[in-house]
């Protein structure tokens, strides 16, 4: 199992979120999930909104192209990124067919 899979042109990511970190960053793998550290606190959806904005910037898409599929109230989240324009340097992550 991998922390990502392609669904057509959409990238599905399984993440482990660490809110209230000192900086926003990809932090390697946490089991079979991509660990992401965010500065936002886990209150009133702030960490989720911050996560969507962070991923949109990292993958070169508009915020509307990143959606939370599951894990709204959990550290374990599944996200969909529609047609990413670029891929950050992450373990094993490549565009399909390459």
From Swiss-Prot:
Read off the InterPro entries from this record. Answer: DUF167, YggU-like_sf
The record's annotation in HAMAP family points to:
UPF0235
Q: Which GO terms describe its cellular component?
A: cytoplasm
Please give the organism.
Ectopseudomonas mendocina (strain ymp) (Pseudomonas mendocina)
Q: List the disulfide bonds.
A: none
Q: Which Pfam families match?
A: DUF167 (PF02594)
Instruction: Please state which protein family the record places this protein in.
Output: Belongs to the UPF0235 family.
What's the protein name? UPF0235 protein Pmen_4153
